[in-house]
């Protein structure tokens, strides 16, 4: 059995056409189904529907053989048991700092609100900047507006939400897209099968990119 971990939303919607190129199609619509384990048209392949931030955990610990996760999630993840063989070039966005329009950055310790705590620590350590990191799980834009933080670090797509709240994108930390991740043990045990799937997905990505 080959198990693939996916998260609902944009990543799932963009991944399903790529999997279809490999003949892997869910037997029911994951967006409408309440099931978290979904069979596919290949009897020995199933999909696990999990939270986006949990995809690397399921794959590293062998609960799934493969998964699709955003690079932002992988940058924040601290595990070691993953291969990242393919950039699927889907769900593209940017990981950026943002702050109030026209605000002057304080010279002392910077207060940064984010759910990407590990990314923030690395980013500011590389700059030699002292920061206090405040972990939030959502509504990041509020933090600078009410004085909780000087800046935020978050995923930015169009930037419309930032602008609607009087914020502006500032420094680019990373360009984000979704990646195929593979469990290291699964890659050894089912190498031919998984490598064939990787090759098929790579061709599908290249074909879509050329198109």
UniProtKB/Swiss-Prot annotation:
One example GO MF annotation: ATP binding
Disulfide bonds: none
Reaction catalysis annotation: 1-(5-phospho-beta-D-ribosyl)-ATP + diphosphate = 5-phospho-alpha-D-ribose 1-diphosphate + ATP
Gene Ontology cellular component list: cytoplasm
Top-level EC class as recorded in UniProt: transferase
Pfam families linked to this entry: HisG
Subcellular location: Cytoplasm
UniProt keyword list: Amino-acid biosynthesis, ATP-binding, Cytoplasm, Glycosyltransferase, Histidine biosynthesis, Nucleotide-binding, Transferase
EC code(s) of this entry: 2.4.2.17
Listed InterPro entries: ATP_PRibTrfase_cat, ATP_PRibTrfase_CS, ATP_PRibTrfase_HisG, ATP_PRibTrfase_HisG_short
Organism domain of life: Bacteria
Pathway terms, separated by semicolons: Amino-acid biosynthesis; L-histidine biosynthesis; L-histidine from 5-phospho-alpha-D-ribose 1-diphosphate: step 1/9
GO BP, one annotated term: L-histidine biosynthetic process
Quaternary data: Heteromultimer composed of HisG and HisZ subunits.
Annotated family: Belongs to the ATP phosphoribosyltransferase family. Short subfamily.
Domain notes: Lacks the C-terminal regulatory region which is replaced by HisZ.
Role this protein plays: Catalyzes the condensation of ATP and 5-phosphoribose 1-diphosphate to form N'-(5'-phosphoribosyl)-ATP (PR-ATP). Has a crucial role in the pathway because the rate of histidine biosynthesis seems to be controlled primarily by regulation of HisG enzymatic activity.
Protein name as annotated: ATP phosphoribosyltransferase
Organism: Pseudomonas fluorescens (strain Pf0-1)
């Amino acid at each position: 059995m080959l198990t693939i971990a996916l998260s609902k939303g944009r990543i799932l919607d963009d991944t399903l056409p790529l999997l279809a190129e490999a003949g892997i199609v869910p037997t029911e619509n994951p967006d409408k189904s309440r099931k978290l384990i979904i069979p596919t048209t290949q009897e020995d392949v199933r999909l696990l529907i999990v939270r986006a931030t949990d995809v690397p955990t399921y794959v590293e610990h062998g609960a799934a053989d493969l998964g699709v996760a955003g690079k932002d999630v992988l940058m924040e993840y601290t595990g070691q048991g993953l291969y990242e063989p393919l950039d699927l070039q889907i769900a593209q966005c940017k990981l950026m700092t943002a702050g109030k329009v026209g605000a002057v950055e304080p010279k002392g310790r910077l207060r940064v609100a984010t759910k990407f705590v590990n990314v923030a620590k690395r980013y500011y350590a590389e700059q030699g900047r002292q920061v206090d990191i405040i972990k939030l799980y959502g509504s990041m834009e509020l933090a600078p507006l009410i004085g909780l933080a000087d800046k935020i670090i978050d995923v930015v797509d169009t930037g419309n939400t930032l602008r609607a709240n009087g914020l502006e994108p500032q420094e680019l930390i990373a360009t984000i897209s979704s990646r195929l991740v593979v469990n290291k043990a699964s890659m050894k045990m089912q190498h031919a099968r998984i490598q064939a799937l990787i090759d098929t997905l790579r061709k599908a990505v290249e074909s879509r990119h050329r198109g």
